[in-house]
Amino acid sequence: MKETRVAYRYAKSLIDLAAENGVLDRVNADMAGIESVFKQNHQLVAVMKNPIVQGDKKHAILEALFGGKVDNFTMSLLSLLTKKHREAVVFEISSEFQRQYREKMGIKIVEVTTTQPITEDQRANFKAIMASKASKVELIEKIDEKILGGFVLKMDDQQIDESVIAKLNKIKNKFTEQVINY
């Protein structure tokens, strides 16, 4: 809970500062990149959370990974976090920043699940389907062979399930219902 509160405050401050200085989109791209690096490298997360590793070593690691590749505001945040011994929450801050950025910009996350990677045309069609529910959408693509075919779209608490497995389950339920009623 404490990490969530800390992440919220740092992310909010960074969003406000970046927006005030006209670099919000650049900092958003940086935070998405940082989030991706931390998601892909569990050893990096472990090092950042390890209290035995010195703060200057953690700063050197972050500098080597992101120095010269991210905006000055982003690098300043990373430096501040190591000085304040908050480097353990870098991943949480980047995730929270992404959430707050999407909220500020009116972007909704739409999760699309298919059995194989989707094409650009399909991506455009999915965005068009969801355009009536949100003006800006960000597609998160997932592969799940258990749905057998078709797709499942999820946004907030809404779901459009056009998968083969869902249709088979509907047929099975109707058949079972008819057998019971017979």
Curated annotation (Swiss-Prot):
Cited InterPro entries: ATP_synth_OSCP/delta_N_sf, ATPase_OSCP/dsu
Record's bilayer topology term: Peripheral membrane protein
Gene3D superfamilies for the chain: N-terminal domain of the delta subunit of the F1F0-ATP synthase
Main location, first listed in the record: membrane
GO MF annotation terms: proton-transporting ATP synthase activity, rotational mechanism
UniProt keywords, alphabetically: ATP synthesis, Cell inner membrane, Cell membrane, CF(1), Hydrogen ion transport, Ion transport, Membrane, Transport
Record SUPFAM superfamilies: N-terminal domain of the delta subunit of the F1F0-ATP synthase (SSF47928)
Keyword DNA-binding applies: no
Cellular component, GO, one term: plasma membrane
Subcellular location: Cell inner membrane
Quaternary structure (record): F-type ATPases have 2 components, F(1) - the catalytic core - and F(0) - the membrane proton channel. F(1) has five subunits: alpha(3), beta(3), gamma(1), delta(1), epsilon(1). F(0) has three main subunits: a(1), b(2) and c(10-14). The alpha and beta chains form an alternating ring which encloses part of the gamma chain. F(1) is attached to F(0) by a central stalk formed by the gamma and epsilon chains, while a peripheral stalk is formed by the delta and b chains.
Family note: Belongs to the ATPase delta chain family.
Functional note: F(1)F(0) ATP synthase produces ATP from ADP in the presence of a proton or sodium gradient. F-type ATPases consist of two structural domains, F(1) containing the extramembraneous catalytic core and F(0) containing the membrane proton channel, linked together by a central stalk and a peripheral stalk. During catalysis, ATP synthesis in the catalytic domain of F(1) is coupled via a rotary mechanism of the central stalk subunits to proton translocation. This protein is part of the stalk that links CF(0) to CF(1). It either transmits conformational changes from CF(0) to CF(1) or is implicated in proton conduction.
Name of protein: ATP synthase subunit delta
The organism of origin for this protein: Cytophaga hutchinsonii (strain ATCC 33406 / DSM 1761 / CIP 103989 / NBRC 15051 / NCIMB 9469 / D465)
Source taxonomy: Bacteria, Pseudomonadati, Bacteroidota, Cytophagia, Cytophagales
